[in-house]
């Protein structure tokens, strides 16, 4: 046993001794040392978080010396997430309304490069795709002129690239249509008297129920008008007194002359 162990140790030492000689023979060929490759040296993120977007990349030739040469800039399409969630809308029966599936990136490329498909889950707000049925529309818009209660539901818009039918966007629209007599969505009519005064520019203290007072500029105008009225009344009284005294003095002197 001891003899076998000694032999194993001696062979290991001999292998270690010849290892540098083996490594010396593994030289990199001169052709590979001069090789040049194209590498992406800079890249931006996608311009949108969902749907079709764009990213920018800079690609350069890099050699063994690490110097960048012949760099090119390119703008590429990208899709981080093609499902874009839901938008909610509440309208009143009889109103005109439109759903729009377009985005700035689609408009930049041109809507003719895309295919638009709509599906509808009538009468319910949901993203469960099993509830949707085909809806006859192949444009990026759905218009309601006017909208009726049976138009309520969830509309799903799918956008595909025509060149390869790749899905690049899915957007849900939750549409609620209320009866005209159920609720009044008129902002002005829903305000209290104090809120209407505030909306017109009055200053109202809603905490203690104090009477509303005019804004600063209106208070200045009111004060100026008040001062003018008071000054006019006082001036009129003084003029009346002066005239009365003048008339009284003339009558007295005439009487004394007659005497």
UniProtKB/Swiss-Prot annotation:
Q: Which residues lie on this side of the membrane: Extracellular?
A: 26-223
Q: What is this protein called?
A: Transmembrane protein 81
Q: What are the protein's UniProt keywords?
A: Cell membrane, Disulfide bond, Glycoprotein, Immunoglobulin domain, Membrane, Signal, Transmembrane, Transmembrane helix
Q: What does the annotation say about its assembly with partners? A: Forms a complex with IZUMO1 and SPACA6 on spermatocyte cell membrane required for fertilization.
Q: In which tissues is it expressed?
A: Expressed in mid-round spermatids.
Which species is the source of this protein? Mus musculus (Mouse)
Mark the transmembrane ranges.
Answer: 224-244
Protein's job:
Essential fertilization factor required for male fertility. Part of a conserved trimeric sperm complex with the essential fertilization factors IZUMO1 and SPACA6 which bridges sperm and oocyte membranes during fertilization by binding to IZUMO1R/JUNO on the oocyte.
Q: Which residues lie on this side of the membrane: Cytoplasmic?
A: 245-259
Q: Which residues are glycosylated?
A: 42, 70, 208
Name the Gene Ontology molecular function terms of this record. Answer: protein-macromolecule adaptor activity
Keyword Lyase assigned to the entry: answer is no
Domain Ig-like: from-to ranges = 80-173
Q: Which cysteines are joined by disulfide bonds?
A: 101-157
Primary localization class, coarse: membrane
Report if keyword Glycoprotein is assigned: yes
Q: Which GO terms describe its biological process?
A: sperm-egg recognition
InterPro entries in alphabetical order: TMEM81 (IPR039293)
GO CC term (a single one): plasma membrane
């Amino acid at each position: 046993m001891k003899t076998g162990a000694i032999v194993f140790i001696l062979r290991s030492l001999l292998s270690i001794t010849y290892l540098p000689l083996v490594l010396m023979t593994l030289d990199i060929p001169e052709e590979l040392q001069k090789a040049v490759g194209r590498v992406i040296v800079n890249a931006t993120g996608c311009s949108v978080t969902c749907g079709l977007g764009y990213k920018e990349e800079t690609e350069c030739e890099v050699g063994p010396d690490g110097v960048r040469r012949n760099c090119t800039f390119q703008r590429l399409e990208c899709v981080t997430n093609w499902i874009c969630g839901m938008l909610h809308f509440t309208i009143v029966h009889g109103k005109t309304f439109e759903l729009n599936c377009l985005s700035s990136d689609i408009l930049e490329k041109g809507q003719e490069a895309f295919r638009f498909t709509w599906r509808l889950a009538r009468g319910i707000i949901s993203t469960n795709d099993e509830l949707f049925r085909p809806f006859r529309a192949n444009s990026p818009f759905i218009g309601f002129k006017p909208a009726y209660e049976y138009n309520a539901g969830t509309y799903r818009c799918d956008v595909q690239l025509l060149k390869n039918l790749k899905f690049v966007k899915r957007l849900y629209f939750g549409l609620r249509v209320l009866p005209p007599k159920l609720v009044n969505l008129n902002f002005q009519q829903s305000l209290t008297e104090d809120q209407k005064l505030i909306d017109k520019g009055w200053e109202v203290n809603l905490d203690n129920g104090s009477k509303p007072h005019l804004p600063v500029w209106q208070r200045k105008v009111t004060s100026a008008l008040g001062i003018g009225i008071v000054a006019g009344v006082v001036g009129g009284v003084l003029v009346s007194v002066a005239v009365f005294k003048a008339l009284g003095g003339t009558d007295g002197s005439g009487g004394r002359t007659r005497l």
